[in-house]
Each structure stands twice: as C-alpha cells, then as structure tokens.
Amino acid sequence: MIPICPVVSFTYVPSRLGEDAKMATGNYFGFTHSGAAAAAAAAQYSQQPASGVAYSHPTTVASYTVHQAPVAAHTVTAAYAPAAATVAVARPAPVAVAAAATAAAYGGYPTAHTATDYGYTQRQQEAPPPPPPATTQNYQDSYSYVRSTAPAVAYDSKQYYQQPTATAAAVAAAAQPQPSVAETYYQTAPKAGYSQGATQYTQAQQARQVTAIKPATPSPATTTFSIYPVSSTVQPVAAAATVVPSYTQSATYSTTAVTYSGTSYSGYEAAVYSAASSYYQQQQQQQKQAAAAAAAAAATAAWTGTTFTKKTPFQNKQLKPKQPPKPPQIHYCDVCKISCAGPQTYKEHLEGQKHKKKEAALKASQNTSSSNNSTRGTQNQLRCELCDVSCTGADAYAAHIRGAKHQKVVKLHTKLGKPIPSTEPNVVSQATSSTAASASKPTASPSSIGASNCTLNTSSIATSSVKGLSTTGNSSLNSTSNTKVSAIPTNMAAKKTSTPKINFVGGNKLQSTGNKTEDLKGIDCVKNTPAASAVQIPEVKQDAGSEPVTPASLAALQSDVQPVGHDYVEEVRNDEGKVIRFHCKLCECSFNDPNAKEMHLKGRRHRLQYKKKVNPDLQVEVKPSIRARKIQEEKMRKQMQKEEYWRRREEEERWRMEIRRYEEDMYWRRMEEEQHHWDDRRRMPDGGYPHGPPGPLGLLGVRPGMPPQPQGPAPLRRPDSSDDRYVMTKHATIYPTEEELQAVQKIVSITERALKLVSDSLSEHEKSKNKEGDDKKEGGKDRALKGVLRVGVLAKGLLLRGDRNVNLVLLCSEKPSKSLLSRIAENLPKQLAVISPEKYDIKCAVSEAAIILNSCVEPKMQVTITLTSPIIREENMREGDVTSGMVKDPPDVLDRQKCLDALAALRHAKWFQARANGLQSCVIIIRILRDLCQRVPTWSDFPSWAMELLVEKAISSASSPQSPGDALRRVFECISSGIILKGSPGLLDPCEKDPFDTLATMTDQQREDITSSAQFALRLLAFRQIHKVLGMDPLPQMNQRFNIHNNRKRRRDSDGVDGFEAEGKKDKKDYDNF
C-alpha cells in the first residue's frame, strides 16, 4: 500500500487568532519541545469549539481500504494523518500537538531553550531494532530523493512514526468547522485505512489528529514542499492498545514495537538542517511561547470526543518557484570510446558502419587473438585497459599514455564519473586474448538516470540489513588517470554481477543549502556503517592472462633495444625558430611527434638503414621474409597432402576388400535363391506353371476363372549355371582368410610408417651435414626417399590363401646405391621399434636391390622393399642422346634391371586398378588361373602380367557382362585359339611406349603346352567336368531328377588319382603335359 503524501504549501498571513496560536504555529518543522507544552496547546484549542479551529472528518468509518496514491500533489494547509493508518508524514505542516504521539519517531528536545540550543547536530547512530512480535505493525518506507520540478526549499526527510495508542492525544478540542476548505481537502486526499472491523480498535480510533494552525506574520515568500510517495506495509494488530512504544525525553530514543526497515540518508538531512536553521532561529521565541499551549491542547484533546479541527485561512494564490535548468544528458559509447550530443545522435552512431565495424573487429579479436599472438613471435605486449589497445613495447606504451587519444579518453571518463583503471601496464601473454578485460564491459542498453546525486539500485537487498548509505546532493566521482576506482554493480543481490551501460546526468546543487553544500562535497557517495552489515563492493579483478609489470621487467623491456643514429635526425624549424617536425636523413622520412622520435630510433626500419649505411656490425633481429614463410607453408601443405593421400589410400584399399567380400556374399545368396526357384519350377507339373498350362484366352485376354495376369512372361535374369557354382565355390576356397588379410594389412601399414620415419631421419641428417653450405642449394635439394608404393598382388587385390609375400617399392630422389640401402636397413629397425613392439627380422638383399622384412609372429609375413628411382627409366629412354653418357653413376649403384622392373611393377599396378578392378568377374577369374598356375606345372610358365592382360582383354571384349563360368570358358577359348603361339599377334604391354610382347620370355614348347592344356580344359567344360579343371570334388546335385548314375561298365575315377590327370590316361598323347 502506498498512501498519499501531498505537496503542502504554507503561506503565512495575518489572522484573527490570538498571539498564542501564532506562537503555536511558529514551530515550522513541527519539532515538539515537551509533552506538557503540546498538551497545553491542545487544551487551549480544545476549549474553543465555536471558533472553528479543527477540521471535521466527513465520515468516520471503522473499516476502509488504502488505495494507490496518484503522483499529483495537493496543496493544503495541513497534513492529515489518519489515526488508524498510523503513518506519520514527514511533518511538512506546523505540528504543535500530539507530541507524545510523535516523540517516539525522532529525538526529543528539552522544554526550555536558549538562542544557541537549537544548533542541529548529527543524530546518534541508532542500533537496528529487534524483530517485532506478531502483533506489531511493520512499516517499510523507501524514500528516493530526486530532483523535483517544484521545490524551492528542502525540508527534513526523516521518517516519523505515530503509535496507535497515542493518536487520541492528537485530537483537537471542539472548534467551529469550515466545510468549504475541509471538504476540498478531504475530497482530493485518498482515504487510507484498514479492512479490519471496528471492534479491533479502542476508543482512540475515534480520535483524529489535530493540526493547530495559527495565522503567522505576513510574509511574501511561499514555501512549497514536495513529498514523494512512500511504500508502507502495515500489518493489522489484534488490539491497538497493546503496542506501546517506550521513549524518553532525550536526544536519543529507542522503540520496542516499531520496526524500521527504511534507508536513512544522513547527508540529505544535514543539507536540510542547514536550510532550516535560519528560519528556526527566527521563530525561537514564538516556539517557546507555543510549547506550553501545544502541550496543554494535546493533553486535553486526548480525552475529548470532538472530531473538529481548527481551520486556518490561507492565500488563494500560490507563488510558483522557478525551476532549475535541465541538466544535459551525455550518451557514451564504450566500444568506440566517444560521447554523443543527444539520443538521436547516439542512436545514429549505433546504427552506423563505423560502430558496427569496431564491434565486429572486437568480437573477431576475441576469437582469434590467441592464434594471432602465437604466430607473431614471442614479443611481449603492454595493454592499456582504458583505451583497450596493445602496444608492442614500453616506449610505445609510454607514447600512448602521453598521446592525445589517451588523454581525451581520460578527460571524458573523468567528466562522466566513470572508473579509470591504473596506468601501470599489463603484460599480455601469448595464449591470452588482447581483449581479455572487455568481457566485463557494459553491454546493457543505455538508460538515463535523472538524479542530482549518486543513486544505487538496492531494491533487491533487505533494507533492514543496509543502513548508513548516505548520499550528498552534489557528489561526483573525482577520478584521475592515477586513481583506481572499483566498479560498483547496480544489482548487488543478483548472483551474476553485471554493470549496465548508463547515461550519466549531471546534478544541480540545492537552492536552500547555501554554503553548506560546499562543505558536503567531500562526502563520498557510498559509505559503509560498522553497525549494519555493509554491502560488499567487489573490485574489478585483473584478467588471468595478464600480469602486472614489475619495475625490473619493465626496465628489461626498455633495455632490449637501444636507440641508434641520434645525429641523423634533425629538427626542422619555422621562421620563428619553433620546431615543427623531425627529419631522419637515413630513412628519408619526417614526423612531427616528439614522442615518435625515440620510437623511430629504436624501430626496425631505422636500425636496418643504420646497419646498411653506417655500421654493418649492428645486430638487427632477423625476421622471416614473406617468400620464406610461403615456402615453409607450402612444404607443410604438401606434407599434409601426402599424409592425407596415404590415409585415403589405406581406407580405399580396406573399402575395396570389403566390397569384394560383400559382392561375393551377394552373389552366393542370389545364386542359392535362384537355384531354389528353378528347382521348385522343375518339380511342378505342367512344365512349371503354377496355374496349369496356358489355355485359350477369354474375351478380355484372361483365362476363365483365373485372376488377371500380366501379359507376357516376366523378364527373369539368366540363372547361374553349374559352372558358375563351381567357379564361385573354388574362389571361396582360395580366398585369403580374415586372419591373413589382417596380418598383411598390419605389417604393410607398419612398414610404410617406419619408412616415412626413416626418410625424415635421413633428411635431417642431410640438413645437418649441409648446414654450412649454401642456403639455395640446400633449399632446392629433395629428400633422399620420396615415397613408398604397393605393387604386385597386394596393390591389385589378387592375394590367395597361403600367400605370405607382398612387395613394396621405395622411390628415391637419386639412383639407389648400396650405401643408401645399408643406411635404410640400419635405421629401419629403430623406427620399427618406435611404431610397434613386435620383433621383425630385416635382411639386406643387395642382388635384388631390396630389403626383406619378415615378421616373427604367426602368420609369418614377408615384405620385399625394392629401391628404385624414376631417373633410371629417364636415362634408359634417352640412350641415343649424346649427353646421356656424361652423367656418371655412383660406384655402388644397385642393379639397373631390378630398378626398372620395380618401376614397371608400379605402372602395372596403376593400369590394373584403372582397367581390371571394375570389370565384372575379372578379378575372380584371375585368382582361379593363378591357382591353376600353382597346381598344374604346365601353367606355371605362364607370366602373371600376360595372364592379367589376357583375362582383361577376353572379358572386356565380350558383348555383355560375363558370369564367372562364362568368363572362364571365354578365357580358355582365347588361349585355345592359339593367341599365345609363336607367329600370333601376341600380347603387347600397354604400359610401355615401345611395342613389347609380354610373352617374350616363354619358349615355343611352353606356348604349345599351355595351348593344348587350355583346349583339353575346354572339352572338360563342355562335358560338365569343370570340377576336374578346378581341382575340386563334384558338388552334390540340387535336382534329384538329374542325379541318375549310368550303370554302363566304364572305368571308375576312384583309383586315387586326380580326375584331371586320370582322364589323361585314356589319351596319353593329349595329357602328358598335365
């Protein structure tokens, strides 16, 4: 509930009342001097019922409600305080009665006073009252003293409390009512009260407070009081008579039933006391004479049942005080460190491009400052927290402090009263953002605070625990660049303290304080009282990334670089002899800032010119050039690309193997499903039609009595033949197991990583050896080992079960030599120990130009690493060139043919991955033929590269994709046609520029034997004997109808020999070669 506190205006005019009443009204601020005097005054006025002294209350209501008070003030003669509400206004009217009722709210004064007894001293600090009982009325009043548009004279702002039992003493005696004035006042004033019944109050509830008013001496001045609404929380009591305050007639007081939880403003009271002292001393004599009459009137009115108060005439016209000039508002932008003239200018600045760019740059610097600092070397940076800039050295920081920009910001912050951090520099570490302290800067929207003093928003703090926060009418923050000011958060009760951005509004000093205001300027805006729990104001903590600079470290930073070449900087003067600029003859530059002279002499540009032109022995720090930095970045990028290439290659190889297994599984699944389908069709009557043989069609093309079916048979894929089943079964038996594949992948991956480390080791060794040589020659030299590649069956994916040997090719930048081979063999075990804890056996085979690596863990794998170089093939291609023989080979160069074979293996692997890997059934047939070459001696002379070319050409030349059985039959048909015989076109190597026959290593007899064996295998395929060609047992027949044995007397194949070779006994001539 917020009761109304109206603006009361007093005009002192002559009246027809007696001199005693005039003296009673002389107590301008209502300070009661003694209870007897107040009672006498009350008794005096209570004995004049016909003279119209008291106001008459319109209606006496036992229960009424407190309404929200409007902001508008009312001009009346006296302040009316209902007895039930017991809320005493800050006595803006002369209150000469009810001294006993109001003495508990403030310090009492003696009855007799002299002229010097009314000096107002500081009131004794009161202790916090104890918590009230259950039947105690609680008052929570909060006063906010801001600049008003009406007041001309300040008044006492202390809060006074009127006890319920003392209200009866404030009732005036019978007086003649004047309803015109009374009704005007009570109709405009809100009716406040309680919602309780009338039975809860005693007889004192019927009484009303009497404000005895006596016409005063005519005065042309009009005093206007601006009383602002207060917040009161009133709890009803069971019986008002039970709460009795205890007080004494002394300068101090103590209450036991009233709990005061408001905020005391002693500084404001001091200003008001000084304003009221002059008028109080003038009315000293009148107050002495009115004290006895007021005490008598209060004593008499306490037992009088009248409800009339005395009416006091007042002037009809009120003089309006002159309003002070409105202070200008200053809008400040923390990001750009500038102030704007008005809100429109400030709004346009926030929407401008300059502000947005600075804000974006600030956010970007917070995200990338740590990475940028790490790339700029290890130079320490000194940071100015006020301007939020970083300087590269102590001289630059000192120049910034003396500069106009910094001084302008300091002046602006001092004017606005903002905290100014210390000018001591902070060293910013490399991992710390340059804007480390910007996180605590204001980010809230601007808001104007139209107050003439410093005001803290402490509404969220219990006012009972905060006392002694005093403010002055004109106090400011006097801050300089050397003074540290702690930031005061506006919301102290919140868990997360934040400082909002505000608009600082200048204050005006009170018109009535006179010279006292100058004495109060030294009082701080916020004070902590020892009696109450003070609000702890947190200090701004420094960022964790920045550390204060000690004098020793600052001196070390300053002594890092000594200025040179003072004599070469000359002063340029004007006609008057005043120095207008400085000119450096070494650098051919000019500057007009005296602070920049010292920095220029220490700068890198000036020192380089000094070293070039004056002293070549001067030491200048070397910074990498842009070209060198780009070269280094290019090397790093290429290294990352190589690592990414090898990683992707491993993933592709793993994916390729998984795809092959998946395709085989899908093939077998599809084959079994279709085989079951055709078996079911064969068992059905009527040729396998589920609905009987097709009969005559009906009128609509549908057989009578049958559901409609699509016209024409559904296109079915050709089912796998028996040859396909045999080929896929054989392929499954020769495909490597999972353990073998994992072992191969493991040893190959470890070997590749170890060779990479060996290459790095050899490169570092070469750099250290050639460190004293020329930089250009060193930069252009390549690494000794350029890379390692997979070749052979490993790269082509043609591994068979039981294969333990894989091949790798190690490319060198120069021709591989025996010394290089031995160095690699020596370093490889060390690098293998770093990568894997397993043991490996390493042998150096000089004749094979290779290093053989054997694993010691089952399954034992062997890796053959062959050294080669592209230079060998390039020389081989220009053998007819005259200059080819001028380049001499190393004396211990490895075998040339082995290196050429390794290069050819690289080309073969690349061709196979591009042409044969994606061809259907090609890889499967090549595995079948490799197995045939290992089982049958006749086929062992067939070169693997020629066989791969033949299979790829046979399958790719078919008109349609071939199934495994058909593909194997087509390959045997090609060989049987005599394509490998002498005089045939042959098989040319597609990886060679010159025509080269891949079958050149075979003799004529070997060619004929393989052709004859292929023709015999083709005949076996024609008679469903493919299992003999594949070297496997016959598969069980899926259809029992076709599993009928012939009982003719023929020689059985169960004599213990291979069927493929046993058949050869019939015709000794054809099968001697198997």
Curated annotation (Swiss-Prot):
Keyword Repeat in annotation: yes
Residues modified as N6-acetyllysine: K509, K516
| Keyword Nucleotidyltransferase recorded | no
Domain DZF: from-to ranges: 703-1073
Q: Which stretches does UniProt call biased (Low complexity)?
A: 365-377, 429-448
* Cross-link (Glycyl lysine isopeptide (Lys-Gly) (interchain with G-Cter in SUMO2)), chain numbering: K509, K541, K623
Query: Where in this protein does the record put region Disordered?
Result: 120-139, 349-377, 417-452, 703-723, 760-781, 1040-1074
Give expression by tissue: Expressed in Sertoli cells, spermatocytes, primary and growing oocytes and granulosa cells (at protein level). Expressed in testis, ovary and brain.
Residues that the record marks as modified (Phosphoserine) are S1054
The record's Gene Ontology cellular component field reads: chromosome; cytoplasm; nucleus
Extra remark: Knockout mice form mesoderm but are delayed in their development and fail to form normal anterior embryonic structures. They show both an increase in programmed cell death and a decrease in mitotic index, especially in the region of the distal tip of the embryonic ectoderm. They also show a reduction in apical vacuoles in the columnar visceral endoderm cells in the extraembryonic region. Knockout mice die by 8 to 9 days of gestation.
Oligomer and partners: Found in a cytoplasmic mRNP complex with STAU2. Does not interact with STAU1. Interacts with STAU2.
Name of the molecule in the record: Zinc finger RNA-binding protein
